[in-house]
């Protein structure tokens, strides 16, 4: 599901709310989550999961074109850990 699909689905389920208001709310929520992570804070949505930053240590990588070694700096990357309820619901899916 893309962000646009999420907005469309929410707008159709909440027909009393204008689609633009739904779009603005989704964008504002995602922006707030991104800025919270950028400040190094953890986000927990009970029953769904938590978002946090994990540190990736500096390492030696390779340039895929040339094969040359490249030193990569350490960095923080977003990490999502699903909650138990989400894990349980995902295990029902049989593709």
UniProtKB/Swiss-Prot annotation:
SUPFAM superfamilies cross-referenced by the UniProt entry: IHF-like DNA-binding proteins (SSF47729)
Claim: S-adenosyl-L-methionine is one of the keywords in the record: no
Superkingdom field: Bacteria
GO molecular function: DNA binding; structural constituent of chromatin
Keyword annotations from UniProtKB, A to Z: DNA recombination, DNA-binding, Transcription, Transcription regulation, Translation regulation
Name of a matching Pfam family: Bac_DNA_binding
Assigned GO CC terms: chromosome; cytosol
Swiss-Prot/TrEMBL GO biological process terms: DNA recombination; regulation of DNA-templated transcription; regulation of translation
Family: Belongs to the bacterial histone-like protein family.
HAMAP family in the record: IHF_beta
Assembly: Heterodimer of an alpha and a beta chain.
Function: This protein is one of the two subunits of integration host factor, a specific DNA-binding protein that functions in genetic recombination as well as in transcriptional and translational control.
Matches recorded under NCBIfam families: hip, PRK00199.1
Protein name according to UniProt: Integration host factor subunit beta
Organism: Klebsiella pneumoniae subsp. pneumoniae (strain ATCC 700721 / MGH 78578)
Organism placement in taxonomy: Bacteria, Pseudomonadati, Pseudomonadota, Gammaproteobacteria, Enterobacterales
Gene giving rise to this polypeptide: ihfB
